A protein has these predicted regions:
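Alpha-helical transmembrane segments of multi-pass membrane proteins
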Residues: 13-17, 70, 107, 111, ...
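PDZ peptide-recognition modules
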Residues: 79-94, 106-265, 269, 273-276
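Interfacial loop-to-transmembrane junctions
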Residues: 328-345
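Alpha-helical transmembrane segments of integral membrane proteins
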Residues: 5-12, 293, 297, 343-350
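Juxtamembrane boundary at the C-terminal end of a transmembrane helix
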Residues: 353-364
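Transmembrane alpha-helix interface/packing and boundary motifs in multi-pass membrane proteins
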Residues: 258-262, 298-313
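Residue-level signature of transmembrane alpha-helical entry/exit and packing/kink sites
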Residues: 1, 5-9, 91-96, 100, ...
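Small-residue-rich helix-interface/hinge motifs
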Residues: 4-82, 305-327
Length: 364
């Protein structure tokens, strides 16, 4: 079963890469730029065919996670192919810019279309109801432990107030807010818990945690959650999807900013192995909806990262094209090629680092 989820994760990555490369491919075909090769996957070659009409070689490889769309002379250093009419650099700047940008754009389109499908299928969340508090663990020496609360207990009432069906109006974590507002000298909190089908009253006196600077009882808990949904129209699904994708993109940019400026999140950042592990675990534990949500998030991520002006990525190539368009003269091709090569080497080194760390993480 685990193999199934791993293959599903590889398929997800393959779909995103294929859509990205298809963006480059169809933009090139639309603008008349010859495509040298178009491939999906990596590993042993399963299928290969060269078009007699266009000269494009189409390749399908075993592992569906990766791909490419190559052009004549795109990273040429010696300039030998500059007179070749198929050379990418001989095409108009706007044609090359459109071809470069359509890869990331198609990732955004994929994320948006999937999001619309999700909202049309499951509806719009119009309300959230919170329920009973399930105790997962109890800290040794904490107030809850001394009061007799045990893992597996379910908090039904706090000071005789029912925890079930609380609306999302600021009271959804009423049990926890009562703990936060507790002050020394107050009466202990009366918690009615369900234990093995029976109701038991326990009296808990929260304590100030110096590290957190808040009142705590020493429990790890899970709160029941029910989302109230309504069917939404196509127009509403489009609105929700646009907002969802923009919000997701904003969170990704904030995370990238923190990673670059302060190193925040470096330990949580991973490469392909970590991504596959995350997709596998989420799909296995939470189902197909989680799979689609990850597809949306990773697709937006792929589109945004590729637009960054990092040598070797689409964003960097777009910058060189903008310079050429503004000054009517390209940066020397060999200079641009070496800059992209340096970018590839750095990115490859980063990829190796994260892959190595992810593999170590798997076997800990």
């Amino acid at each position: 079963m685990t193999l199934f989820f791993v293959l599903a994760a590889l398929l997800l990555l393959g779909i995103m890469v294929m859509v990205h490369e298809c963006g480059h491919f169809f933009a090139a075909r639309l603008t008349g730029i010859p495509v040298k090769g178009f491939g999906i996957g990596f590993g042993p070659k399963l299928f290969s065919r060269k078009s007699k009409k266009t000269g494009t070689e189409y390749v399908l490889r075993l592992i569906p996670a990766g791909g490419y769309c190559s052009f004549y002379g795109e990273d040429e250093v010696d300039g030998k192919g500059q007179n070749d009419p198929r050379n990418l650099n001989n095409a108009a700047v706007w044609k090359r810019l459109l071809t470069i940008l359509m890869g990331p754009v198609m990732n955004f389109v994929l994320a948006f279309v999937v999001a619309v499908g999700v909202f049309m299928s499951i509806g719009e969340t119009v309300d959230v109801r919170y329920g009973y508090v399930h105790i997962e663990s109890v800290a040794e020496g904490g107030a809850a432990k001394e009061a007799g609360i045990l893992p597996g207990d379910i908090i039904m009432l706090v000071n005789d107030q029912d925890m079930m069906g609380l609306a999302d109006d600021g009271e959804q974590f009423k049990a926890l807010s009562m703990i936060d507002s507790f002050r020394e000298g107050d009466e202990p909190l009366k918690m009615t818990v369900e234990r093995n089908g029976e109701m038991t009253d326990v009296f808990v006196t929260p304590r100030l945690d110096a590290a957190e600077n808040r009142m705590m009882v020493g429990i790890s808990c899970r709160i029941e959650l029910e989302e109230i949904k309504e069917d939404c129209s196509l127009i509403r699904a489009v609105e929700l999807s646009a907002d969802y994708c923009v919000t997701t993109g904003g969170l990704i940019l904030d995370a990238l900013k923190g990673l670059v400026t302060t190193g925040e999140g470096l330990n949580e950042t991973g490469g392909p192995v970590r991504i596959i592990e995350t997709i596998t675990t989420a799909t296995r534990d939470y189902g197909f909806l989680a799979y689609l949500e990850l597809l949306i998030a990773i697709s937006v991520n792929l589109g945004l990262v590729n637009l960054l002006p990092i040598p070797g990525l689409d964003g960097s190539r777009a910058v060189f094209l903008l310079i050429e368009g503004i000054f009517r003269k390209p940066v020397p091709r060999n200079v641009e090629a070496y800059i992209h090569l340096a970018g590839y080497l750095v990115l490859f080194g980063i990829l190796i680092f994260f892959t190595y760390r992810d593999i170590l993480h798997l076997f800990r």
